[in-house]
Each structure stands twice: as C-alpha cells, then as structure tokens.
C-alpha cells in the first residue's frame, strides 16, 4: 500500500510538471513519459525472471524445446487441468472432506482476466505504433473490449480468491507466506478495479487523481512481479513443459 501511494504521488508530481499535449489521459501524462517510466519497469523484472528461469531449467534437466511440448504445457495450463486433481473432483482446500472446483474456476478468472488486460495493452501498442491510431479509443475497439472484460474478470477473481483463502486451512500451506499471498492478490485486484473506475469516471474532474492511483498500482505490480506469487506462473509453465518432455521421452523409450 505504501508503494501504491508513493508511486501515485510520483505520478501526481509528474502531472504537475505538465504534458506536451494530447487527448484523454495524455492530457495529464504524455505518452512519451508513460513509455519512459513503464518500459524499464516492465522489462527489467522480466529479465530477472528470465535469469531465474534459466537456472531452474538447468536444475530440472530441461531439454531443447519442441512445439509438441509447448502445446501440451499450454493446454494443461489453459484448462487448469491439475487443479481438477487426478480424480477430477477438484481440490480439497478446506478443513473438511469436501472437494470443489471453486479454486480452479477462480484461477481461471484471474489468469484470463490478466491475459485480457495484457492483450488490451499489446493491441493498443500495435495500433499506436503500427497503424498510427492513437488513444483514446472507443468502447467497441479491441483495447477497450479486452481491457474492460479483463478488468472485470480480474477484480471478481481476486475478490473471490481472498474469500476462498479466508476459508481455507492455512496449515495446508506455508503459514508464513499467507500474508504475502493476500497482499499480492489484493494488489492485483486493485489494479483491475482502479482501471475500471478510471474508465467509468475518465471524463470527470477526478480523472487525474484516478489516473495517478491506477498507474501507481500498475507500476508497483510490475516492480514486485519477480518477488510475489506472480512468479509462480512462469515456473509452473516451465515445469509443465519439462513434464511434457519427460512423458515424451518415456513414450519413445517404451
């Protein structure tokens, strides 16, 4: 929370310096300023994750990638197949003998919500630099459709995950990591929620303050990415790829 507030104040200070002009959000903070701040904040954490993944890959004896291994891993990840458990009844995450697919469905909402938000930014970048189509975009444009639907899934999914973790038995996991997990989920959900509020009130006088808060939360999320549970997505995908390699090797050996 301190980081979110701090970064929001930084953006507010940048806004006070002024903008070179533009429409919508760019009237508050120029496009070049956003790129200068967010490009390194996004790329440097990815470099950190890439270095650790390379070490992990060597540790587990990973082999050169094949398309079939990648397709198998992405298929399992997309379906959240392992959260259905081997018996297909879901996870027993509570202190009861009851299985549920709730955890799987909530993970689906968070993952696809995040991917839609990422797709929104990616499409907007291509439209801006590739086709000269600059923001703001209308509601029926791909950036808005991806962003709004992704923000809703992300907000609802993170809220449901917090409720689920409140009900779950903490002793089934690492109790010392529980607080960090909750903090990360709340931050990710706040990114989605603040984006939706910013879209809804983007034409009002509170837009500059909302923009500062939203961008501050996004920047915080990027910088903390290698040190939060967000990193488990990268490792999980790598583990699924290695598992696909092992299965292929066993089938060839037989």
Language model region names:
Residues 1-254:
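Membrane-embedded alpha-helical bundles of multi-pass integral membrane proteins
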């Amino acid at each position: 929370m301190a980081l979110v507030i701090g970064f929001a104040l930084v953006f507010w200070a940048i806004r006070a310096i002024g903008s070179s002009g533009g429409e919508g959000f760019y009237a508050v903070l120029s496009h070049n300023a956003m790129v200068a701040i967010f490009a390194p904040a996004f790329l440097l954490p990815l470099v950190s994750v890439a270095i650790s993944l390379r070490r992990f890959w060597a540790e587990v004896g990973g082999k050169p990638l094949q398309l079939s291994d990648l397709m198998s891993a992405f298929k399992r990840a997309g379906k959240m197949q392992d959260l259905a458990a081997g018996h297909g009844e879901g996870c027993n995450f509570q202190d009861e003998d009851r299985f549920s697919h709730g955890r799987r469905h909530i993970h689906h909402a968070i993952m696809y919500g995040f991917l839609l938000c990422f797709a929104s930014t990616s499409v907007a970048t291509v439209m801006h630099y590739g086709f000269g189509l600059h923001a703001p975009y209308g509601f029926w444009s791909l950036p808005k459709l991806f962003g709004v639907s992704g923000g809703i899934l992300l907000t609802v999914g993170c809220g449901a995950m917090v409720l689920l973790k409140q009900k779950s038995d903490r002793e089934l996991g690492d109790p010392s990591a529980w607080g960090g997990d909750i903090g990360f989920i709340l931050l990710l959900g706040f990114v989605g929620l603040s984006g939706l509020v910013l879209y809804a009130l983007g034409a009002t006088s509170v837009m500059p303050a909302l923009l500062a808060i939203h961008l501050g939360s996004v920047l915080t999320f990027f910088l903390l990415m290698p040190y939060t549970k967000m990193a488990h997505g990268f490792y999980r995908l790598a583990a699924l790829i290695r598992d696909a390699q092992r299965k292929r090797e066993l089938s060839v050996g037989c």
